[in-house]
């Protein structure tokens, strides 16, 4: 990317994927965290394009403060020419150790597997994340939760909301239900809690998560 990644582009990405892989049938969308937010917004923007939606801790951020806009624009401009490369590691084990440090519930063996999927080996023999560091650049515009909620209200897909039992993200659901989205997709969706997992459910308890998703898709 020449600059930062723009949030609306993620929505367009899903639409392009549908055109390529499922032009004649609705999608079954699964998204985690920001990906869950993107998937849920798309499901409201094009409800006819999504039959099933699995939102794994993807309810976005709290509403942003417009008063922070000047500093956000300043930060965006200043960071354009200050892209920081990802750290290099001596081995997969070193990267795996860092992954485990941030996700206490996974074993070192699983962390090594995750590291092998996330990383690439450089000519120097070092290990580096296989990702674009520009994805870390700030966006010029702040997150507008009210716009996301407007999209969520239009979701017609069968929906599964997934939370980690040890995650604080579950608290995000309470204000949503108590606000102005009564009789919405969220109140009519199925909600499950995954034991032994925080926010990174797909790393910490993937077997339990996969089972819940499979049951949801097969039985709905």
Predicted segments with their positions:
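Conserved catalytic-core motifs of eukaryotic protein kinase domains, centered on the activation segment
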Residues: 1-4, 64-67, 172-173
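Active-site loop/oxyanion-hole signature of alpha/beta-hydrolase fold enzymes
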Residues: 1-30, 211
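Core-facing hydrophobic residues within beta-strands of well-ordered domains
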Residues: 11, 24, 49-50, 186-189, ...
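A catalytic-pocket lid/entrance helix-loop region that shapes and gates access to the active site
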Residues: 56-89
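Conserved alpha/beta-hydrolase catalytic His-Asp/Glu region
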Residues: 85-142
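Catalytic histidine-centered segment of alpha/beta-hydrolase-like enzymes
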Residues: 197-206
């Amino acid at each position: 990317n020449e600059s930062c990644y723009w949030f609306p582009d993620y929505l367009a990405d899903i639409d392009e994927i549908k055109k390529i892989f499922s032009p004649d049938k609705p999608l079954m969308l699964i998204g985690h965290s920001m990906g869950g937010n993107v998937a849920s917004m798309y499901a409201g923007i094009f409800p006819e394009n999504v039959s099933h939606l699995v939102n794994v801790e993807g309810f976005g951020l709290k509403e942003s403060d417009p008063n922070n806009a000047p500093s956000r624009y300043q930060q965006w401009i200043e960071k354009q020419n200050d892209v920081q490369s990802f750290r290099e590691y001596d081995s997969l084990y070193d990267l795996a150790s860092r992954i485990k440090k941030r996700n206490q519930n996974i074993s070192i063996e699983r962390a090594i597997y995750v590291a092998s999927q996330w990383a690439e080996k450089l000519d120097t023999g070092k290990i580096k994340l296989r990702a674009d560091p520009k994805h870390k650049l700030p966006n010029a515009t702040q997150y507008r939760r009210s716009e996301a909620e407007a999209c969520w209200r239009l979701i017609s897909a069968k929906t599964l909301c997934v939370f980690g039992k040890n995650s604080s993200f579950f608290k995000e659901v309470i204000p949503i239900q108590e606000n102005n989205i009564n009789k919405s997709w969220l109140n009519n969706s199925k909600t499950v809690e995954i034991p032994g997992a925080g926010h990174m459910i797909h790393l910490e308890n993937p077997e339990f998560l996969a089972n819940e998703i499979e049951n949801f898709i097969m039985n709905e």
